[in-house]
Amino acid sequence: MEKKMKLFRICASITLVLLGFVLTNTPSRYFLFFNTPEPVEEVVKVAKKVDPKQLACLAKNIFYEAGGEPINGQAAVARVVLNRITHGFGSNPCNVVYQSTVVQKENDEGENQKVKLCQFSWVCEGKGEPNKNNPKYVQASQIAYDVLAYDAYNDVVPKSTLFFHNATVNPAWPYQQVKTIGNHTFYSNKKKQKKMNNDR
């Protein structure tokens, strides 16, 4: 019995020595039961408070200007409105969307008449409230909310992008073209560089 106890103690000692060696020379990742998970850094965007009136103005502009465009095209129109705020076109989306001016213009009879010019054509056309259940308006509203609440799609066009037009027309704008998305071509506020005349 005594011999068995001595043998047991020897075996136990050897086992502990070997276990200690393994634990001190083996990376801890192989012993999951000793590990504590490494903290994962998670970026959580907090939604900004959105004014329903401003949301409606931006959503209507997206809907009327780009309702049939791809999501990026609609988002680009929304970003143009926000870019204009930072460039002094207005202090909020509604100011920018409904910005207009009245000018004197000569009609076909040679008479001067007052003409209202709008930043966005649908405003001058007097279009009213869209059908809130229209799937395209629902999508436009979601894009508008994401842009206002989370600053979403902030890389779809540069922050200098302030203008756009339908790609089927070709106005003589002096601005640099940024990109075309769907049926809209977007421009920055930077003037086109004049071509150097190298003829001698």
PLM regions: where:
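Hydrophobic membrane-insertion alpha-helices, especially the h-region
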Residues: 9-26
